[in-house]
């Protein structure tokens, strides 16, 4: 309801701070333009609890990305303060933040996802890797420090860079179209096909404004239904709630592979979730409204 006090959480201290600031501003501007009693709070530093206790919001729109918004700490804090919010629970956030844990759960339930394992100094030295492969931090977002490697030399460089962000995983490389689906609780939106500026949808491709987006994706009716069902099943298996996004690769044999689940997706002008909603005829303001009104 519009008489509720809403805090938009954005910023934070993760490597995705700048993207989060843009998401937060877009969401805050939308809420205010729609008549909501909304204020923005930068979650950086150590004063977040004090700010929330002072403001006493009814709901929080979580526009934090990376560890600050997706590792479960903010969800846990909001739940302890009994503040409804737009992201997943602490438990689900912890799981989805760690790509390896998420992948192991999905594989246990026979969901289609590329094979992967943790990458260590020992494994790099053994030189028994099948190329090409993807190397990335196990935790993190926006494809920061994510590499396609085709040789042991590239592998060593990628491992060195990715390890700056924590544990590193190496994943089977799957060639195909990059597809994504946004979800808000029981609402599953249209798939979006991304044609990245670079070889894959890396950090530069995401924020340069040069990638091409097809929304709707152009999948046939049967495949559109299939990818939406897979997205919702993955969302449910990992215990997600509120706003999330499921990313896929769609190969030339007609197979979908779940790449990851993002429990606090971007909400900038260039972000994928608003494009997914727009393909259903839901504009940005309406999408923001749906997300905040379904906060749990």
UniProtKB/Swiss-Prot annotation:
Give the catalytic activity.
Answer: 2 D-alanine + ATP = D-alanyl-D-alanine + ADP + phosphate + H(+)
Record domain ATP-grasp: where: 103-293
Positions contributing to Mg(2+) 2 binding:
260, 262
Which residues does the annotation say bind Mg(2+) 1?
Answer: 247, 260
Q: Tell me where on the tree of life, at the top rank, the source sits.
A: Bacteria
Named in its record, the pathway it takes part in is: Cell wall biogenesis; peptidoglycan biosynthesis
EC?
6.3.2.4
Which cofactor is recorded for it?
Mg(2+); Mn(2+)
Similarity remark: Belongs to the D-alanine--D-alanine ligase family.
Q: What does the UniProt record say this protein does?
A: Cell wall formation.
Name used for this protein in its record: D-alanine--D-alanine ligase
Species for this entry: Francisella tularensis subsp. holarctica (strain LVS)
Q: What is the lineage of its organism?
A: Bacteria, Pseudomonadati, Pseudomonadota, Gammaproteobacteria, Thiotrichales
